[in-house]
Amino acid sequence: VLLEWTKGMNVPDAIGKDPVKLLEEQLQKRGINVQIVAMCNDSVATLMAHSYNTNTACVGVVLGSGTNAAYVELVSNIPKLHTEIASPTMVISMEWGALGNHDHSFLPVSFLDEEIDSHTLNPGRQYLEKMMSGCYLGEITRLWMRHLRQENKLLSRTPLQNCLFCERYCFDSPLCTTILLDDSEEREEIRSILESFGISDSTTEDRNTRSSTPLLRALLD
């Protein structure tokens, strides 16, 4: 059954229910004759897919909108398993995006991570996922750019009232890649991105992603 939602999704009526049955019911209502034979975790599916190519695959990792990992474990090492099974091994979904739930003192949490967490639907949970996954990287970058702007180290001529500094999740994660890959002399891709936020007076230094310039720090620090 579905225990909880993550990554901003919120459908309370689905909590505690079997998502496969819910999906099948909706498919049937639409006259779509599909029978779901298995629901597979993405990291488990990644491991299984690669296992078709090599029988030595032992870990599957997903780094996408969220993050997770699955690995092959000896059944003898799984004390929670009370049912006897024929196989000596089992694939375990680690759900490592939840590392830091309730206690994140062992993680390198910054003030940016704390702000991200405080404005989510599940504060205090999925801490590692919020620190590194694609769903949040754009917002982490935006918050860091806002911090640099507040210290007049980036886009100092742009008002703090600009949507880039005020509107949550307006800076999509793929923009980080676009910025880092822009090697044109005048950083035209970066200029275009800034102009989409109404910033038309950026300096060359603002747009420069070489060395330790402000925009590079905003993306990578």
Go through each PLM region and give its residues.
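Short beta-strand-to-turn element immediately C-terminal to the catalytic PLP-Schiff-base lysine
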Residues: A70-L74
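ATP-binding/phosphotransfer module of carbohydrate and carboxylate kinases, centering on a glycine-rich
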Residues: E25-Q28, S51-N53, V59, S76, ...
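Short glycine/serine/threonine-biased micro-segments
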Residues: C58, V62-G66, E95, M132
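A short acidic Gly-Thr/Ser loop motif
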Residues: S43-V44, V61-G66, D221
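Glycine-rich phosphate-binding loop and adjoining helix at the ATP-binding site
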Residues: V1-S51, N55-V59, V75-L107
